[in-house]
Amino acid sequence: MTNGDTIESYVPARLDRLPWSSWHWLIVVSLGATWILDGLEVTLAGALGGVLTLPDTLGLTPARVGASATCYLAGAVVGALLFGYGTDRFGRKKLFFITVAVYLIGTALSAFSWNFWSYAIFRALTGAGIGGEYAAINSAIDELIPARVRGRVDLMINGSYWVGAALGAAATLVLLDPRRIPTWLGWRFAFGIGATLGLIVIFFRRWIPESPRWLMIHGRNAEAEEIVAYVEKKILGTRGTAVSDSELFRTRIRTRTHTPWHEIWDAIVHEHRRRSFLGFVLMLTQAFFYNAIFFTYALVLMRFYNVPEQNVGSYLLPFALGNVLGPLLLGHLFDTVGRKKMITITYGLAGILLALTGSLFHAGLLTAQTQTLAWTIIFFIASAAASSAYLTVSEIFPLEIRAMAIAIFYAIGTLAGGVGAPLLFGWIIGTGSITALFLGYLVAAALMILGAVTEAWIGVPAERQSLEHVAAPLSSKGL
C-alpha cells in the first residue's frame, strides 16, 4: 500500500467491540507500569529530600532539593516532546522500549551521584525517560482499550502511580533507617528499586503489539488486520462475535507516512483550539496542585511537625492509599455519569478541600497525623481529577497527533505547574513562614477550581465513544 491511498478499515471498531480479557490485562500491566515507576521516583525524591540535606549524604540545601525535583520535571518535559514526536512518527512500540531504557539508565546512575550537579543531571535523564513514557504509553493504551471502559481503565492505570508511591514509601522505611543501613548508603540503594522494575517492564513489553490504529494510518492496514484477527482469535476462540464486520462503523482515511509540523500546528492551535485550551488548563492546574505538595511534603513534615527523616515514609503510606483508591472507586463514574460532570466535580472539590485544610494548618489546628489524614482525603478526590486530565488530552485529539498532543500539554502543564511549584514551595518552606505556605496552598486550590470551571464550560463528553468519533483522524478530511 502506497502513501496517499484511500482505504476503509474496520480495525478501530473491531478493537472497541472486544470483550475484556486477559490480553487487555497484559496491556494494563506491562504498559501501565509507567505510572508505578513515576510514582516510585517522585516518592523517593520526596522522601529523600530531607536525607539528602544531611552532611554524610549530598549535603543539599532545601532550595537545591527543590531544584533537583525541578530537574527531574524539566527532563520529563524534554523527553515527552522528543519521544512524543517519535511515537507518532515511528510507532508506539519502538518508542515504549526506548523510553523505559532511558529511564532505567537514569535511575541507576542516580544511585552513584557524588554532588548536586551529578544528581541533578541523572534525575533529568530519569525524567526524560518518564516523560517519553507518558506520551508513548498513553497513546498506545487508549488505542488498544475498548471505548466503553476507556475511562475507568485509564484512571485505574494513572492511579497505579500511587502503588509506586507506596512501594517507595515502604522501601524508605527500611533503606533510610540508620539502624539497618548506614545513611550514606541507604539512599543509593533506593534507586536500585526503579532500575530493577524497569528490567521487568522491558521483559513484559515484548508481547505487546504495535497499535493497529497507528499501522492503519501509516498504510499498513494488512498488518493491523492481522494483529486484530490474532487478538480476536485469542479472546473469542471459535465463538466469533454477535456483530458482523459489515454492521460495524468503517473508518475511511488516506494513508500517510508522517504528519508535517504545519499540520500538527494547525490542528492544535486552530482546528482544535478550544480543546487545546481545555487540555492546557487541566494539565497545568493538576500539575501545580500535585507537585506543590508532593515534592515538598517531606520538608513540611520535618520542618513544621518535627517528624524524623527516617519516619517520613510511614506518613506517605495512607496518603498513597487514598490516591490509589480514588481512581479505582470513582473511575467507573467517568464512563457512566460522564467525563464532563465527573471532571468538574473532582477538580472543584479537590480545590475546596485543600483551601479548608490550608486554613486549619495556618490556624495551628493540625498535627502530623491529622495533616496526613487531610491530605489523604483531598487526594482521594484529586487523584481521580489528575488522572482525568491525562485521559482527556489522550482522547480528544486526532490519532495522527495523539502522542504529540499528550507530550505538548504534559510539557506545558509541567513547566508552568510542575517545575515552578517545587521551586516556589521549596523556597517558602525554607523561610519557615506558615503564612507564606498557607498562601501557596490557596493558590493551588484556586487553580483546581479554575480547572473545574473550564471543564464545565468546554469539556468534551467522550464517554463510551470511539476515539475516531471523539476526534476524526486528520487523514479522513475530505473523504
Where does each model-flagged region fall?
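Transmembrane-helix signature of 12-pass secondary carriers
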Residues: M1-L479
